[in-house]
């Protein structure tokens, strides 16, 4: 296909127009008084959102060169979202500012490669200073503040803080759409997996159709149990001990199933059988997780295990087990805490090593089940449009909270960036164009606070000067129009989000400045359609 080419200033200006179109659309959402953007959807109602990356993903421009610029900045938002889960609007805004300031200097004759070196040096210094002013997250109150700022809603902040308190920092919190009007929290403590009882005759509560076992023993095997003779020696020991039994096996069928059900109905002893969760290698890993949690052993042919030789000390234990038609929940497994910790660390190492999104999700689920539980935030609203908007806000708040727990918090509202300006401005370079790069970052660091003020209908430059001349940590609360200590006021941003936004913006923007030629496809002209033939009298 034939290509069209642009060079030098013309190429950069065309791409900058695309950058500005995308960034100007996204940046109206920044801050407590930021507005929303409405996105047309081919199917269903339009989506109203203030999530930077969601807006950026929707933007495709007709002009090929403008679209190239827009796609580059979209990468800034996407990468920041992948790393930190929030801060995508800030990252887009910073990229626009660095590109704008950089292009002025490139047009004036500065060398873009040297400018890039200066930008890199300044960003490294800024990140170092941001980490110095970072404070660790202390308790539920800090978590609630981070989530409330991200979602612009104190109720959501409290809800996420409750969820994290219940499932722990390693626990999994998912966001789902609710059929009711309100937003609520549903917590599943302990380990739950999607396998129910193999026979309805095993239930202990016929009204709720569920089996609840207190202080049961847990038999874990990857074998199919069909011959009752394999189980008899173990069952006799369990009956003598007066214990209840949960069997997790590949399957329970035939004679074994009949015997277990008959004994349950006669009241000889209580036993519930469930199929092992997962498939293939994942099933083996999940059975090992259950064994670690309950302090049992997986009886498997792979390690020479035989059901006939199984003893009580091979079985796991738990405080309680609840089995429904669809799921099994093991609460407070009696496994060795040191072994559980080692298993958790092992899964974390696998998480770091894998590149598959699917594997990551499954490993994260396993981690949560071992480390505490799963919380589900059920989002409710009056209309589908409001529901989608709320769900995106909560997902952002959740990501921001996890980022804050990981690396700590800094003063919010763009204050952290303004606070590090003085230290970055002290950097000097003998090479003039590198110094230009440093100065570009110094100016760009003001941009988030300026935009937050602008979205609140105020003059950003005046506010920035006042914050610069105030004590460290003092910023501008755009919601109330007051200057205050941001951390004490609970206006905070996660360090990871603040750092990632700047690093990703600088990475893409500085590379953008080095562009000297742009190549794009020549758009195909549509051929005019021919006139229709007359078909009078034909039906």
From Swiss-Prot:
Pfam families: Cpn60_TCP1. Its main location: cytoplasm. It catalyses: ATP + H2O + a folded polypeptide = ADP + phosphate + an unfolded polypeptide. The keyword Chaperone applies. The keyword Cell membrane does not apply. It comes from the Bacteria. Keywords: ATP-binding, Chaperone, Cytoplasm, Isomerase, Nucleotide-binding. It is an enzyme of class 5 (isomerase). Transmembrane segments: none annotated. Its EC number is 5.6.1.7. Coiled coil: none annotated. ATP binds at residues 29-32, 86-90, 413, 477-479, 493. Forms a cylinder of 14 subunits composed of two heptameric rings stacked back-to-back. Interacts with the co-chaperonin GroES. Belongs to the chaperonin (HSP60) family. This is Chaperonin GroEL.
